[in-house]
Amino acid sequence: MVKKFFITAFVLLSGLAVSAQTLEKMNWFNEPSQWNITNNKLTMSVTPKSDYWRISHYGFTVDDAPFYYAEYGGEFEAKVKVSGDYKARFDQAGMMIRIDHENYIKAGIEYVDGKFNLSTVVTHHTSDWSVITLNKPVDFIWIKAVRRKDAIEIFYSFDDKEYTMMRNAWMEANRPVKVGMMGASPDGNGFNVTFSDFSVKHLPDAVRTEWLEHNK
């Protein structure tokens, strides 16, 4: 009985370790001038006049905002807590899932005309933008992304317990993606943002799981 207990405990602890992401081992794309990692929290000063956007509506393409990421294959659930000192129009921070400069999804909080919005940009050659306006300011938000088959589901939460979907978008299946934390200040002089409790948990491949279920 004791032996069984220790084996079970080891398995549970191992599972937690797999889902946790050590921030020090991640990589920068467009590293900002100031950033710090303390107690597995990332704080950065978002680069002024930086963003991610391709072509549609505005007519320009930019790919120069700070993005701190690790690369993952297969299917997964990723989440992060975001708290920012948003100041200027379009200041934004959240999670990004990226294949390359023409294929990515970014989702989080975006500050527009004095209001806080849950914002998602989906880019496949050209970008689109969807928002959900919040009725009051928030100190922080949780963003969760679930990759299954050829789709990414994006959720938000105010307490890391009850999650609400904000977007379901296509993303090419069976390609490694960069997953991490992003901030942008397209119209401003930058701002400070803190990301905490970032984690990525592997999920069993849905197609393979379905095949195994039907071929027992």
Q: At which residue positions do the language-model features occur?
A:
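Bacterial Sec-dependent N-terminal signal peptides
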Residues: M1-T22
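Extracellular glycan-recognition regions
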Residues: Q21-K216
